[in-house]
Swiss-Prot record:
Name this polypeptide is given: Holliday junction branch migration complex subunit RuvB
A Gene Ontology term for the protein's cellular component: Holliday junction resolvase complex
UniProt EC number: 3.6.4.-
Organism: Proteus mirabilis (strain HI4320)
Functional note: The RuvA-RuvB-RuvC complex processes Holliday junction (HJ) DNA during genetic recombination and DNA repair, while the RuvA-RuvB complex plays an important role in the rescue of blocked DNA replication forks via replication fork reversal (RFR). RuvA specifically binds to HJ cruciform DNA, conferring on it an open structure. The RuvB hexamer acts as an ATP-dependent pump, pulling dsDNA into and through the RuvAB complex. RuvB forms 2 homohexamers on either side of HJ DNA bound by 1 or 2 RuvA tetramers; 4 subunits per hexamer contact DNA at a time.
Listed GO biological process terms: DNA recombination; DNA repair
UniProt binding sites for Mg(2+): 70
Record SMART domains: AAA
ATP-binding found in the keyword field: yes
């Protein structure tokens, strides 16, 4: 099963979706919905850097996928009035790949590295002096004739994004002056995002219809916008084009997204714990084998929301389905 196949995947799926997402993506902090603590702190840090005519300190953003890490990087570049250069950890295979990007930066530019936890050790070593001293150490030649030269870099801001902050090496993590964690969004903020996106897309939507979509979006704006597009299709074919509570509810039910935002893969995971393993505890490897998924998919994609909403617990002995999960599926939790 590929994560991108899921309707409620937090990954970008189609080029059309990416184009729409870029169009409706907020450009400034004033337009940024949710994450009030992050927004307030970044506003202060950005203003202070601009007053000093300095580059913003290096920033690490972590949290589950789809919560706006790339959006925040774009906003920072816009607020600072500088260019944004974008790449990702897996793309930077050799030290020369990173060196080429660094030497093309203008003063105070933002370099955004997505999936920064996947940088190779060789590339990471190049990054240390670049972050600390704005210098690039390059080896010229090989063997006894090899020598190191230093290239000065303009002051820049590195923005690293990751879903797995614990996978970063300590030396890399310690070089970020600002660390921000993005949390799952509440329903009110997601409803605001639905209404804003619908306005950009020229859709008529009621407050109740927007809330129905928000409630089933797993706290994730990217999923919110994806569900909105699918509900739009349903409203245009089965209704008069307007999205009200009834249309939204029927569309999402047809798409097998339930009231908690679960799809078949979430239910498969929870039913495996409840039925196959008697509610748990069950080890991650056994659980992955039982549902035919990679353990990384469970850890990075499924579990964060289920744990945050109180449907499963991680224990030293494995994963356990909570009373909340049993109630959601109208099951009775047997006494141990």
């Amino acid at each position: 099963m590929i994560e991108a196949d899921r309707l409620i995947s937090a990954d970008i799926q189609q080029p059309e979706e990416e184009i729409i997402d870029r169009a409706i993506r907020p450009k400034l902090l004033a337009e940024y919905v949710g994450q009030p603590q992050v927004r307030e702190q970044m506003e202060i840090f950005i203003q202070a850097a601009k007053l000093r005519h300095d580059a913003l300190d290096h920033l690490l953003i972590f949290g589950p996928p789809g919560l706006g890490k790339t959006t925040l990087a774009n906003i920072i570049a816009n607020e600072m009035g500088v260019n944004l250069r974008t790449t990702s950890g897996p793309v930077l295979e050799k030290a020369g790949d990173l060196a080429a990007m660094l030497t093309n930066l203008e003063p105070h530019d933002v370099l955004f590295i997505d999936e920064i936890h996947r940088l190779s050790p060789v590339v990471e070593e190049i990054l240390y002096p670049a972050m600390e001293d704005y210098q690039l150490d390059i080896m010229i030649g090989e063997g006894p004739a090899a020598r190191s030269i230093k290239i000065d870099l303009p002051p820049f801001t590195l923005v690293g994004a990751t879903t797995r902050a614990g996978s970063l090496t300590s030396p890399l993590r310690d070089r970020f002056g600002i660390v921000q964690r993005l949390e799952f969004y509440n329903v009110d903020d997601l409803q605001h995002i639905v209404a804003r996106s619908a306005s950009f897309m020229g859709l008529e939507i009621t407050a109740e219809g927007a809330r129905q979509i928000a409630m089933r979006s797993r706290g994730t704006p990217r999923i919110t916008n994806r569900l909105l597009r699918r509900v739009r299709d349903f409203a245009q074919v089965k209704g008069n084009g307007e999205i009200d509570e009834d249309i939204a509810s029927k569309a999402l039910d047809m798409l097998n997204v339930d009231a908690a935002g679960f799809d078949y893969l979430d239910r498969k995971l929870l039913f495996a714990i409840i039925d196959k393993f008697m509610g748990g505890p069950v080890g991650l490897d056994n659980l992955a084998a039982a549902i035919g998924e990679e353990r990384e998919t469970i850890e990075d994609v499924l579990e964060p929301y289920l744990i945050q909403q109180g449907f499963i617990q991680r224990t030293p002995r494995g994963r356990v389905a909570t009373n909340h999960a049993y109630r959601h599926f109208n099951r009775i939790m047997e006494a141990p």
